[in-house]
Structure formats: C-alpha cells, structure tokens
Amino acid sequence: MAPEMSEKGPVLRLLRPGPIPREDLRKIAKVIKPKRTKADHIEAPGQIESHYAPATPLMVIDKPADFVPEEGVKYGLLSYRGEGNSSLMEATEWAHTEIMSPGKGKLAEGAVRLFYCLRKLDAAGVDVIISESVSETGIGVAIMDRLRRAAAGSSQK
C-alpha cells in the first residue's frame, strides 16, 4: 500500500489484498487499485501473476463436485479446516495432506500457514496439489489472491 494525499483526504493505492480487508481501509481513506500497464511497471513482487507458484502444479477447486481425480496421479490436498469439513477430503486417497487451520477454521491462521503448507506439499513428491477455496471475506480475499497466483503458472487447470 502506498499512501497519498488528495484534496479530499488520504488515498491508499492497494497493490494487492493483504491482512487488513479493503472494507476496513475504506473507513479511514479512499482506496484505489493502481492501473496496470506493462509487466515492467510492477511495484510489488506479489503483483506478478504467478509470484506465489510452487513447482508442483496447483489447482484451486471452488466446488468439490468439480474435482474428478485421474487414475495413477498422486494428489496432495491443501485443506482449510481438515477432516469433516470438506467433501474434498473424501474425493480420493490423498498422497499428502496439509491443513491451513487445523480444527479451528480461522482465516487468519490459514493466511499465516498458507505458504508453509504449500511448501510442504511441494516437497512431498505429489504430482498435483489440489487446494480448497476459502470464503472471500476479510482476509479470505488475500488468501484466494495468493492461491490464484500460485495456480496461475500451473499447466493443469
């Protein structure tokens, strides 16, 4: 975020979603998203489309029913809350599972653990990482932004 002043008060240029939700920032300042022109005008590494990408292909699944596992593929699961909270848990036999917010279901904890869990899955030797989506409210907007960027470079969609 880069603060600026205008005749009407403070203006925040939101480079990418972060831990403070846009709705909260709007309470204290006007919030704008900078216009993107060329890749060489990127102001923060997180603005690069695939900045957060693991080496292992990553797919973000919004609806568990949309995931159909392929035979012979070793899948890793990035789960938000873990057992009993996702029908993705039952979709296949997972080669490795990482849970962002074990037993708690707290978006803030999920945000803190996101890259730790992605790196563990990347090192686990799976063929594809499957990630559940999270609610796009509050810090969930930032989590989904990071997940989409991580999946952007994947050959599998």
Label for each model-derived stretch:
Residues 1-157:
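Active-site-adjacent structural elements in enzyme catalytic cores
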